[in-house]
Amino acid sequence: MIARDDITGLILAGGRGSRMGGTDKGLQPLHGTPMAMHTMMRLTPQVGGLMINANRNLAAYESFGVPVYTDTVPDFAGPLAGMLAGLEQCATPWMVTAPCDSPFLPTDLVARLAQAIEAEGADLAIPVTLDEDGRRQTQPVFCLMPVSALDSLVAYLSGGGRKIETWAASHRLAEVLFDDAAAFANINTLDELRTHETR
């Protein structure tokens, strides 16, 4: 059994925020609280500890009271670079990731991913949702992985790889169906943020 205390949560806040006009998405307020803080509040009860991957506004993220680590791969290499930074610093056997703009993530996310890894003998686990037409949508930026995946991630990034799904598929991967697709909604634009503000 994968115990909660054996899992560290990593909030991915290292992106450019290009679809939000270059603003730092994790620090944009939703109902008066930064989005990354909403994500932290959802994830905290599910893990033994937390850390943040960020590449700018480091003092602001450090004020959240958890360790902050920057990418060790240059040029904003995407979420996998953030995952790499997290794995390099992770002090527990397992790490789970969530993007900073996912303030509605399921409260049972980590437990269900951990159960699937155990039940299927998998290495990694990611959620899957269904869109309005019933098509499967993988949510690979939410990923439970062992720290031992570090070497394969280094090799994949060194070879120029950037897609989470491709890297994840090179392992024994458990895909866990979640009914509430809205729980995985990312807030990518200021218009989407305003829409959620009025709900």
From Swiss-Prot:
Binding site for Mg(2+): D101
Binding site for GTP: L12, A13, G14, K25, N53, D71, D101
One Pfam family linked to the record: NTP_transf_3
Enzyme Commission code(s) on record: 2.7.7.77
InterPro entries linked to this entry: MobA-like_NTP_Trfase, Molybde_CF_guanTrfase, Nucleotide-diphossugar_trans
Keywords, comma-separated and alphabetical: Cytoplasm, GTP-binding, Magnesium, Metal-binding, Molybdenum cofactor biosynthesis, Nucleotide-binding, Transferase
Substrates-to-products reaction catalysed: Mo-molybdopterin + GTP + H(+) = Mo-molybdopterin guanine dinucleotide + diphosphate
Listed CDD domains: MobA
Subunit record text: Monomer.
NCBIfam families the record matches: molyb_mobA
HAMAP family: MobA
Comment field on protein domains: The N-terminal domain determines nucleotide recognition and specific binding, while the C-terminal domain determines the specific binding to the target protein.
Record's protein name: Molybdenum cofactor guanylyltransferase
Gene: mobA
